[in-house]
Amino acid sequence: MPRPPVVARTLPALRRALDDLRRRNATVALVPTMGALHDGHLSLVRLAKRRAAKVVVSVFVNPTQFAPHEDFGSYPRTWKADVAKLAAENVDLIWNPDVKTMYPEGFATRIGVDGPAIAGLEDRFRPHFFGGVATVVGKLFLQVRPDVAIFGSKDFQQLRVVTRMAADLDLGVKVIGAPTIRERDGLAMSSRNVYLTPEQRQVAPTLYRAMKETAKLLKAGRSAEAALAAGAKMITDAGFALDYLEARHAESLAPVGSIKDGPIRLLVAAKLGNTRLIDNVAV
């Protein structure tokens, strides 16, 4: 039987648990999550175990990164299953605060983000999002004080924003991006995939196929404008409502015009019915 992780729900309990973990100067890795864990999350946990002696997983559905019309209330919450999965991975500590612990009455301080990493893409459609992400991740870093933190590359713009924030604010955390984990048909694993109907689930992998085709055209020398137009047509022809398909510099996230401006990352967001999916691939 796997050893159940310690669960902390208050800051004093978290500090006591962290003091125990850090005996003999053990290194600590943090994997921030919103729960509803799948194999993609567990791949982050496994990478964390390779990068540090002790692993902390936070499970907190952060209300400040949801707009009023988004799915905060219906976001999947699978606590018992999450704990069982983390126990099977021998996670040392689960940090599971409630909203009042993270945002007590009178809370008035937020982290703002700026620069090319936030320009366009998700910020255009969810202007509240990265302020909420930066604030909650900044708090998690200060609460846990990990040596390393593991984030999935599926949320690539988020990864770049968090990496920049940790460096700019001298938080002393090494942010590591882990590869996107995909289903056999190429669909990126996501907690929101449960919203897809069976018919939509059959269509959803088109998003990944369209990005691969766009990358192929870029590598063949087509301009970003032409390659992106071809990829966008594949996506909309499949029934998606496309928010964006863009080619950006993989480090700065500045827009690019051709393969010569690389390294390039393709980033996409589109809605299939009521479900919004995001993904990205390297070129």
UniProtKB/Swiss-Prot annotation:
Q: What is its main location?
A: cytoplasm
- Ion transport keyword on record: no
Keywords per UniProt = ATP-binding, Cytoplasm, Ligase, Nucleotide-binding, Pantothenate biosynthesis
Task: Identify which top EC class this enzyme belongs to.
Answer: ligase
User: What does the record list as GO biological process?
Assistant: pantothenate biosynthetic process
Q: Which residues bind (R)-pantoate?
A: 65, 158
Q: Which residues bind beta-alanine?
A: 65
EC number(s) for this protein? 6.3.2.1
Among HAMAP family, the record links this protein to:
PanC (MF_00158)
Q: What does this protein do?
A: Catalyzes the condensation of pantoate with beta-alanine in an ATP-dependent reaction via a pantoyl-adenylate intermediate.
Q: Fill in the subunit field for this protein.
A: Homodimer.
Tell me what this protein is called: Pantothenate synthetase
Look up and give the organism this protein is from. Answer: Rhodopseudomonas palustris (strain HaA2)
